Amino acid sequence: MNLRDNYPQPYTIHDARHWVEFNHKFNPAQNFAIEFEGKLAGAIGAERGKDELRTNMELGFWVGEPFWGKGIATEAVKLYTDYIFDKFDIQRIYAQVFDFNGESMNVLEKAGYIPEAILKKGFIKRGTVGDLFQYVKVRGED
């Protein structure tokens, strides 16, 4: 699975309810479900940096396998990026991607994000160390 380890696996209805309740406190909203043809297809959200990094937000998203290959993630990232720059005093949005997740790298590039850095041996997942690719979209740079 391409999600971070703190993401519940399997993801239960209890987990979904907790996520919805947790997100009610944000105004403006920071996290959204991704809907496609009336069905939950995934989720997208961002977390603001703290202190000196408060002009940054880290983007995260997922789309369920039945919805892959339909352009849903790319469209969601584009719309969400515009929303974040409109609603928040943010200068940059970045996303970190495991080296084995080429699909997410493609989504980010199609949505206008550019490769910014490779964090060599930047993560460990399922006992394997790998590189972490960082993509960025900077306000006003297209």
Positions of PLM-derived features:
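Proline-rich low-complexity regions
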Residues: 8-10, 28, 74
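Acyl-donor (CoA/ACP) binding surface of acyl/acetyltransferases
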Residues: 31-142
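Conserved GNAT-fold acetyl-CoA-binding loop/helix
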Residues: 1-21
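Short loop/turn motifs at secondary-structure junctions and domain boundaries
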Residues: 22-28, 113
